[in-house]
């Protein structure tokens, strides 16, 4: 018997970066942990937090398939792009390369399920200059993510503007209040899509 044959209920796999990891939410461990608590209180579903600090599109492209296969993914959520923008002086991924990699990520995800939800990159607090990211850059990446998502008949949730300056620890990473705002927005979108997670 293979390991993934033991999983008999739906599995929601959330792929992404440190924002998905949620370590800056000292109250509940991030929006994915909050989503897990919400879903587990109502229905039988496995929610996997597959966020990795510092991940860019290049790293996610390498790990998505084996991790989705190991968990027999029923639904895949992709929340990626902040590190590709480059921050704290690091070089970002140019738009053309980001487009190519993100399209390949969607293609890989599509091998496991048609139920794919992509999340737009969060707005940043530009008054905090420590991260070096502009909302203009964020919007350019979000346009790419939305276009590629729609082209593959997947679903896109725009979260730009969902958070206020006080919802960040450093202008880029959400704090507990930021994660508390994100979790119900994402849960409602999953419910709106009508995917049977029970």
Positions of predicted regions on the chain:
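Alpha-helical cap/lid subdomain in secreted, periplasmic
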Residues: 6, 37-43, 61-198
